[in-house]
């Protein structure tokens, strides 16, 4: 997962990459809605966000759309843990399956924190 964004006090431009994390993703099917798949994804990993080493945990719910694309969201169930505190996140994105059996999503993430490093 790459994090691209802007923070008022960081002096970065909108769309500038401010960090990335790598880890494992596990998925499980949830009950279908109107015959379309719904999946839950749990991501656990680590990396660097805004120069701080972090551990990331997030639970997403992704729903297939009638045109084959996907919409995913993580409403207040994303966590970044740094040495000096935590940040909670809300994510939403659209995506599509990849040729190798995975998925790719593009979207937005909002974080709230009192950790000085984040």
Describe each region flagged by the PLM.
Residues 1-118:
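Beta-strand-enriched cores of mature, soluble protein domains
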